[in-house]
Structures are given as C-alpha cells and as structure tokens.
Amino acid sequence: MYNNNSSTSSDSSNSEEKANAQHASSTDSTSEHTDPAVADEGFPAEQYQSADLEKQQLLIEEGPGGFPYITNPERFYVSLEPSDPRLAVNWPTHVKILHVALLAFTTLTASWGSSVFSAAATIFAAKYHIGLTVALLGMSLYVCGFASGPILWAPISELVGRKIPLIVGMFMFSIFSIAVAVAKDVQTVMICRFFSGFCASSPLSVVAAAFADMFDNKTRGPAVCIFACITFAGPLIGPIAGGFLAKSYLGWRWTEYITSFMGFFSTLCLLFMKECYSRTITEQEAARLRVEYNNNFIRAKSEEEYIDFKALAKRYLAVPFVLLFCEPIVFLLTLYMSFVYGILYLLLEAYPIIFAEKRHFSLGVDALPYIGLLVGVILGAALIAYFQGYYNRKLDANGGKPVPEARLPPMMIGSVLFPAGIFWLAWSGYYTHVHWIVPTLSGLLTGCGILTIFMQSLIYLIDAYLFRAASVIAANTIMRSLVAAGFPLFAVQMFHNMGIGWAGSLLGFIATALIPIPTLFFIFGKRIRLMSKNTVNL
C-alpha cells in the first residue's frame, strides 16, 4: 500500500485523478468521479473528494529542461505491511510446499549434472583415447563452474529477484548440456561442462535465499535442510542412473541428453513460480499502481536506489575473502565444509575402485552402494529435525532472535560419525573377502555426518553473520567448490598407490582432527562473535 503517514499523503497521491475529474466537470461534482478502488488502496473516499486541487498542483514543479519533478517523493512511496499476503513469508502453506517441491527439483537437476558424467568417464576416456584423470576433468570443471557462478547469480538475485536468475540459469544449463551431448571432441566437452556448471550454480546460489524469503526463523531450518538434502542427493543419484545409461545401447551421450531434458522441464516449471523476494514484490506492486492510477510518481523506494556495480563487485569479490581470512569462525567452518564437500566428490571415484575394481561389480551396479550414503543423508536430516525442538526453545528464550550456537549439537554428533564412517569404508573395502554390504553400510555414518556438518555450519554462518550473509556464503561456496573440483583428480592415484585402507585412513585422520571445531564454537562461539564487528550481536 501507499505510505500513509498523514492525510496529505492521501491527497497528493490522487492528484492526477483529481485533475481528470476537475477537467471533466466542476469541483463540486468530484464525488461522482470517485474511484472506489482508491479507498481499497488505503485512501478514504472523503479525503479524495475534499482534496484541495490547488494544493496538489503545488507539489509538482518544473525542473531543468522543462521536465516536471516532484518535491515530496516520499508521499508516493509504496510499501507492504509485514502481514501482507503478497509477501512470500505470508503465503499459504500449500503454496509454500509447492514452491519448495519446485525449487528442490531444480536443485536436484543442477547437482545431478555434476556427477552423472562421472559414471561415463571410463567409456568417454576409451572413446577419445585419453586418460581417466583427463576424463574426470569433465566433472571437476563442472564443479569449478559451481565456484565461479555465484559471483554472477547472487548479485543479480538481489537486483531483479529470485525468479529471473533461476529461469535464465536453468535454460542456459540445458543448452550447454545438449552441447556436451553433441560434442565431437574433448575440448568442446570440457568447455561446455564448465559453462553448464556455471549456469547450474544459479539454483545453488538462489534457492537457499528463496527459502529464507518464504520461512521465518522457526521454520527456516527444516526448509534449508531440504535444500541441503537435495544438494547431496543429486551427486549420489547421478552415478547410478549414469552408469546404466552409459553401458546401454543409448551410450554416454544420453547422460547429458537426460540432464538437458530435466533442465528444460525445470525451466518450464519455473515460469509458473511466484516471485518471493520482498523487494521485487514491492517494486512489482508499485508498477501495477502506476498503471492503475496513471501516476508515474508512484514507486518503491528501492527503485530510486543507485545501482553501484563497484559496491556489488566489492561485496561479492573483495569482502568475501576479507571475511574468509580475517574471521576465525568463517575460516574454520568454511575449511570444514570444504573438506566434507570434497570428500563427497572424492567418494564418487573411490566407490568404483572398491566395488568395480576389487569386487568386479558391473557398470551401474557399482554405483548402487551410493544408496547407503543417500540413506545416511536422510538420517542426518532426521537428526537435525529431532533437534529442531531444542533450537525453537532457545529461540523463544532469546525473544525470537537467532541463537547460532543452538544449531551446533547435531553437528557435534555428525563430526564424530563422519570419520567413523570413513574408517569403516576404508578397511572393510580393503579386504575383498568382507561382504559388499559391510562397506555399503558405512555410508550410513558418512552420509549422516556429511549432511549434519554441512547443514548446521551453513545455518550457523547465516545466523551469526546475518547482515553479511551474502558475502559469507559467496566465500564459502567458492572455496568448497574449488576443493570439491580438485579432490576427484587425485582420488584414483591416491587409492591405487596408497591402497584403499591407508588412503581412506588418511582422510579419516584429517576428519578426526576437525572434530573439535563445532564443540569449540558451541562453548566459545558467542565470545568470539562479540569480538567481531561483522557479526550480529544476538
């Protein structure tokens, strides 16, 4: 609605309607021309009818060059009440669920694309007579696209809303996926895989922010948990489908055709998505009112803000790295998340060694043990949901303000389960006489640890750096994506040269060394935050 601070704001906002009425008849007959919609928009009809036309005209003066300008623009600002049903946080539950499902599928498609190619890497390498490590660049370059994409998509989503970056990103993702499928040489595949990942980073950059738009402090945790589950489910499902596709008569190219079809379907669905960013919703309402009342002075205050591209570049390029290397909380949690995310993509190469090379599983079947990891991710989500009541009690006790440290208990449990799962996989996978179900079940602990560590770290950073969240998440996304891109490239050599047992143990020892991080912040986190000028004093 309009910003109604006084009755004069009502008078000024309808100056053009009054002028039209005055031109058609005398001032005494203005009541006959009163638009009932005026009262509906917060303008009482009595004030509209008794407006002083001469006073209204004084508000508009002639500026340089003869162009009119308004001396009191604040009277025409459009704002929405916090309880306005058009705001995403006030949408009905069924509408939110529909949007969560849509955004979840979009995220699944983007993350699926990162790993579906890995299942066909062996066939791709044989076809073009290249080494397996070179073939795996197709996956690593895609994840490198994840690292660079947020630099573009995150600021765009703050300028034009969430919907447009998602539609453009997923459409271009689909185009580049087709380009990979029809490529005639290795370099074309690699270049298009990078740009496919760059475009696929759109939902990874925007969906979490969209969930934050739709849900309050109490319900945001479960919503972001769904996002995290899908983010990890995609890379685990991709190799299963990709393996069976690659060995079928369809061939490896159909791993990309199917991916592009999923991308186009996501794009089509996103066309029906409602905008959820409050700034964009307000600007759209202002545009509607400008047309309805034929008054070009009506606008949202954000429309008058100067777009400072230098400030945007600083926010998403310079500030993230300043925070990363100057804030101990950001540095340690980003380090931990990067290692966990890297392990996820490393396991995409370790599992084929354990199950295909050592146990002689066929292509496609060798990816089925990823189901153990997938179930572990679901168990991690259940663990987080179990602690949601604990967090809500802390939230209520703090007057509704976020309590970052209350997010950490599930992560403390996951930090122990994670290395336990890695050690389990390493030594049960090393001995081939051990039944295949034993290393498969290790994924229950590993997957649970991966999700709880990643998820709770992410929300902790958002809660602690609320006003710097965009910059913190940008730094986090860039760093963990670069690490994840590098891990698969040395995984094969490490597991071949060191052996499955000791290669896995090395990773387990590193994971064990990182166990104290969540406990450290649970005890001293608030004290550390109080020493920083970038955190929120909660």
From Swiss-Prot:
- The answer on whether this UniProt entry bears the keyword Membrane reads yes
Q: Which UniProt keywords apply?
A: Endoplasmic reticulum, Membrane, Transmembrane, Transmembrane helix, Transport
State the source organism's domain of life.
Eukaryota
What's a single GO MF annotation on this record? Answer: transmembrane transporter activity
Pfam families assigned: MFS_1
Q: Where is this region: Disordered?
A: 1-43
GO BP terms: namely: spermidine transmembrane transport; spermine transmembrane transport; transmembrane transport
What the entry lists under Gene3D superfamilies is as follows: MFS general substrate transporter like domains (1.20.1250.20)
Q: Where are the membrane-spanning stretches?
A: 97-117, 134-154, 163-183, 194-214, 226-246, 254-274, 328-348, 367-387, 408-428, 434-454, 458-478, 504-524
Where is it localised?
A: Endoplasmic reticulum; Membrane
Q: Quote the biased-composition stretches of kind Low complexity, using this chain's numbering.
A: 1-13
Q: Looking at the keywords, is Metal-binding present?
A: no
Q: Quick one: signal sequence residues?
A: none
Spell out the family assignment given in the record's similarity comment. Belongs to the major facilitator superfamily. CAR1 family.
Name of the protein: Uncharacterized transporter C36.03c
Native source organism of the sequence: Schizosaccharomyces pombe (strain 972 / ATCC 24843)
